[in-house]
Amino acid sequence: MRARFIACVLMVLVAASGAAAEDGCGRFDWRVDREIELFGEGFFADVESQSALPKDGAFSMLLQPVAQVIYIVPPERGRDDGYGGIVTLEWIAAGRYQITLSGDAWIDAVQNDKRVPMLASTSRDDCPGIRMSVQFDIQSVPLTLQFGGAMVRRLNISVLRVRENYGIDSWRP
């Protein structure tokens, strides 16, 4: 009886891990487990475009038509159609950060009125709730994130520091 129970538990675990791999979430260039958990919880502060936040974390950005967004630095990809917005993180420690989006959009990171070069990006269209993740080296000065080209009015966004071994620092709202 006990052996059957253990066998059943193992089968469920194998099936669950297979489902995650099948839906594409396990196929990003780096792990997005923390973002999956955060986005799956569904509780986010709604942030209007042009808002300032005190620090990194996860939030839901309420976008507006791109034509109405006033970008600090001209977008690298132009002013695509769709929706966009900007948000400034007022205090952020220096380091490598992973910024993950729930939907398709472009993103620019800006510090000291200059675009921060993107170090890496990965995207998938087969991971429910997560579309893309990018990494930047950030200085310890305010960080403005510019978004555009989204076809949805609300975008879940996480800004999490990457640890030295490229794991994500733990963050809870």
Label every model-predicted segment:
Residues A15-A16, G129:
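Short, intrinsically disordered, low-complexity segments enriched in Ser/Thr and Pro
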Residues M1-A7:
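Bacterial N-terminal signal peptides that target proteins for export
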Residues E22-P173:
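Acidic, Ser/Thr/Pro
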Residues A16-E22:
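Bacterial Sec-dependent signal peptides at the C-terminal "C-region" and cleavage site
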Residues A7-A15:
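Bacterial N-terminal signal peptides
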